[in-house]
UniProtKB/Swiss-Prot annotation:
Enzyme Commission no: 7.-.-.-
Record-given protein name: Energy-coupling factor transporter ATP-binding protein EcfA1
Organism from which the protein derives: Streptococcus mutans serotype c (strain ATCC 700610 / UA159)
Residue ranges the record marks as coiled coil: none
Subunit: Forms a stable energy-coupling factor (ECF) transporter complex composed of 2 membrane-embedded substrate-binding proteins (S component), 2 ATP-binding proteins (A component) and 2 transmembrane proteins (T component).
Topology of this chain in the membrane: Peripheral membrane protein
Gene for this chain: ecfA1
């Protein structure tokens, strides 16, 4: 069995056959089982198009997409979709149930899950995202963060191999974003799911195993978060903010402190500062 759960080989895509420049131009990359891959890049770089191709919502002009070793095609697209759950930027567009628990059960009913198992999955999913107390609420009456947690609960209840988050945290306040990212991390650890996250959020990127940078429909780079953050001011051109520790290090350099070019986590920066101060 291959360790690649997703693989794209020389994939090209156009929304319109008369489109001179393809939206995606001969891209190739893979995602490993259980990996958290963040995809970043400016609007129009091809991020959302890529994940919609993986889920079979769009069809590639050329190239191959393999999910768990199976080439995605018209014949198996529905089977492939059962392995993947997507959570979008605006959860209101995904709600169909009158209550939170009804909404989570909807996808399970369509899948033909027996009633007893369905109830167990709904309870488990709500507990996992800390929304059990809201099970009889109308989704429309929830806060933005609560809605996204319900959307994630619905995705998890389907027991997919892969969860795709298409800017799922972008409309939340900082506290709601951190809570949701923590929930995703907990789900990943508990179920060993593969996570693909389209994001501009530094906390999300930091938690990922690998970061794919997309630019003009192509793969600009693939690296660890630490390697990416070491690129300094280039991050602004990639649609990311400068990490807090990088800003502090830049200011300290200006007053005479010496640092190498390696990106430091907050704890590492704290230890480095204590070491420098103790030498004074």
């Amino acid at each position: 069995m291959t360790d690649k759960i997703i693989e794209l080989k020389n994939v090209t895509f156009r929304y319109d056959e008369n489109q001179e420049k393809p939206t995606l131009n001969n891209i190739s990359f893979h995602v490993k089982h259980g990996e958290w891959l963040s995809i970043i890049g400016h609007n129009g770089s091809g991020k959302s198009t890529t994940v919609r191709l993986i889920d079979g919502l769009l069809e590639a002009e050329s190239g191959q997409i393999l999910i768990e070793g199976h080439k995605l095609s018209e014949d198996n697209v529905w089977d492939i979709r059962h392995k993947i759950s997507m959570v979008f930027q605006n959860p209101d567009n995904q709600f169909v149930g009158a209550t939170v628990e009804d909404d989570i059960a909807f996808g399970l009913e369509n899948k033909g899950i027996p009633l007893k198992e369905m109830r167990e999955r709904v309870v488990e999913a709500l507990n996992l995202v800390d929304m059990s107390d809201f099970k009889t609420r109308e989704p429309a009456r929830l806060s933005g963060g609560q809605k996204q947690r319900v959307a994630i609960a619905g995705a998890v209840a389907m027991r997919p191999s892969i969860i795709i988050l298409d800017e799922a945290t972008s409309m939340l306040d900082p506290e709601g974003r951190l809570e949701l990212i923590g929930t995703i991390q907990k789900i990943r650890e508990q179920y060993g799911m593969t996570v693909i996250s389209i994001t501009h959020d530094l906390d999300e990127v930091t938690l990922s195993d690998r970061v794919l940078v997309m630019k003009n429909g192509q793969i600009e780079s693939s690296s660890s978060p630490r390697e990416l953050f070491s690129r300094g001011d280039e991050l602004l051109d990639l649609g990311l903010d400068i990490p807090f520790t990088s800003t502090i290090i830049k200011a300290l350099r200006q007053i005479g402190f010496t640092f190498d070019n390696r990106y430091l986590l907050e704890k590492e920066l704290e230890d480095k500062l204590w070491a420098l101060i103790s030498k004074k």
